[in-house]
Regions:
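Phosphate/pyrophosphate-binding catalytic cores of soluble transferases and nucleic-acid-acting enzymes
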Residues: 1-235
């Protein structure tokens, strides 16, 4: 998110400087807020050897003891992280090493402080229709070569130990290749996890009072576009 923040803001400044209006379109709230709101991140990338050290420590002493270590160093952050969430516990320990509190950074999400004044718009529709479209999208991803894509990445040595390979779609297919499940089961699991992710995204954005919502079951695309353009012109 820190790298995205820097890259996105550089593009925003370039577009504004050329007289263009930047438009963000996407679904991951963290990245949108990182670009548009005031959010501070640790400077630079966290060292791989330090993370590996905490991972080795977790394997050696167990997740409960690792969480106890966090509670000793940063009790406020430990209070908001479940002991079983080892990855987040390690992240909080890394941040503490850099003088940053995970809990305090997390609180930045509750009261947005704008870096740019932006108009936020959200589209929603009947949940069942949305879920069916997600299912169809997953089927299309398979038809367009998702399995071959993952196979090619694994051939390059990019396995499930990488955080990026834990993404929905990659993780399940890797498990299928490793014999944990069939490819058909992987496809259905991707659909289920994608639906759950969409639900979490909606819950995230619903907490942001800045967003003007349009119900696409009650509005036409032309009506939505006209409304949005009117709000932009009036801003």
């Amino acid at each position: 998110a820190a790298l995205y923040q820097a890259d996105a803001r550089a593009h925003v400044e370039r577009l504004l400087g050329s007289g263009c209006l930047p438009v963000f379109c996407g679904g991951t709230g963290l990245y949108l807020k990182a670009a548009l709101d005031e959010m501070d991140f640790p400077s630079g990338e966290l060292e791989d050897d330090r993370r590996a050290g905490y991972q080795e420590l977790a394997e050696r002493i167990g997740e409960e003891e690792l969480h106890a270590l966090l509670a000793e160093r940063d009790p406020e952050s430990a209070a908001v992280i479940h002991p079983h969430n080892v990855r987040r516990v390690i992240r909080a320990l890394e941040m503490h090493d850099d003088g940053i509190s995970y809990a305090q950074q997390k609180s930045q999400f509750s009261v947005p402080r704008e870096h740019y004044h932006a108009l936020w718009f959200g589209l929603t529709r009947n949940r069942e229709v949305l879920y069916e479209r997600i299912n169809l999208r997953v089927d299309l991803m398979f038809e367009q070569g998702l399995v071959d894509e993952v196979r090619g990445l694994m051939a390059q040595g990019l396995g499930d130990a990488l955080t990026s390979m834990q993404a929905i779609g990659y993780k399940e297919i890797i498990d299928a290749f490793n014999g944990v499940m069939s490819m058909d089961e992987a496809r259905e699991l991707i659909k289920m996890r994608s639906r759950r992710y969409a639900k979490r995204q909606l819950s995230w954005f619903k907490r942001d009072d800045r967003i003007v919502w349009f119900d696409m079951d009650e509005c036409t695309i032309d009506e939505v576009v006209e409304d949005i353009l009117h709000r932009i012109e009036a801003a």
